[in-house]
């Protein structure tokens, strides 16, 4: 509750300085082959705030230099998951949030928790919400919506990987997809990761409800950058167990020049994804 109030206070204080939300494109084909336009590299989305770290550096930090590895993660959800998150926002948060704000609240909270753990390593996650609607970003017509013919996570991720490979080639970046099914069975895979050249990772997670999926998402993100599976499944991150792998990913994949995977921020900072407040007026963007 206290953390939520702090994020809300920061959001209100800095609201005047935040840029407009990114405009959304409705078609994967309209996006550049590099996955992002050049001017987007190395820039924080408007919902991400920086907090300078002034304490002593941890001995397991990935670098002794005064910079932070920022890792960009783009998220994409099927419509049912979007609606479920938006519907759950009122009883869980006590607020009526617009669709995009509800998604930001859900993933922003996840990112803030991840970043609190990764701060020891000098690494931080940046959530990107462009194209957060999966159906507007990729072709889902071939998906088995019944989830009775093929394993949904494996089948959809395979199809998605091929589509992204055709468009982005070897510059996919890090992308997390949340898939949905009308019902769940114990035989389904709940998460899967596919790797591409240039450190690309395409992740798929099956929606299992807000709380269970939250744990799966955190575990999948950490596996994508560490190679260690089933992290966070007991509610905590064993940083000492994975720090060398995460640091290896950062040093190999996050360069001095901003790129599709992320960039080095020239300061020691912790990133905070500002959690939206209930809003009764128009933000000036379309959902």
Swiss-Prot record:
Keywords: Cell adhesion, Cytoplasm, Signal
Any one cellular-component term (Gene Ontology): spore wall
GO aspect biological process, one term: cell adhesion
Coiled coil: none
Organism superkingdom: Eukaryota
Signal sequence residues: 1-19
Segments traversing the membrane: none
Localization: Cytoplasm; Spore wall; Spore polar tube
Subunit structure: Interacts with SWP9.
Family the UniProt entry places it in: Belongs to the SWP7 family.
Function: Involved in adherence of spores to the host cell surface and in infection efficiency.
Name of protein: Spore wall protein 7
Taxonomic lineage: Eukaryota, Fungi, Fungi incertae sedis, Microsporidia, Nosematidae
